[in-house]
Amino acid sequence: CPEMMEMFRLMEQKGVFLSITLEDGAVQVPEMEEVIQECPDLKIAVGHFGMVTVPGWMEQIRLARHKNVMIESGGITWLFNDEFYPFKGAVKAILQAADEVGIDKLMWGSDYPRTITAITYRMSYDFILKTPDFTEESKELFLGLNAARFYGINTEIDLPYIKNMSE
């Protein structure tokens, strides 16, 4: 729709990020490709890891082949909640996506507070920290450095750990 494209152009001009969850599977991928072509400098974060448990999810992941698109994994533990911690299916999916677009295009997300009904906040990232399937560098990139680069966050600041109420 022209009004939405106008809004996306304005977001691009103003440096506003677009954080978006698409319809399950590949349904909205062609429309998102149009937005990416029209607004090549609009920073886009595709949410919920492309709805990884639904057929066609990899089409959403492939959007990250564009320089301005990242994939965030908020909700991935919810999507793999049936298998529960340590979410081996989620780890496998992240590795598949990394093979497709590179680990530098993927960002961790908690989907907090929704996930507090099923897991602790620590569990939402601990399954990555404790898996032997990622290198230490991949863990650092996925758990924070990629997001810091994408959103322009200064990682030089040393913040103290604050215990979360759900731990």
Could you say what each language-model-derived stretch is?
Residues 1-107, 159-167:
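Catalytic pocket-lining loop regions of alpha/beta-barrel enzymes
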Residues 111:
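Catalytic cores of Mg2+-dependent Asp-rich isoprenoid enzymes
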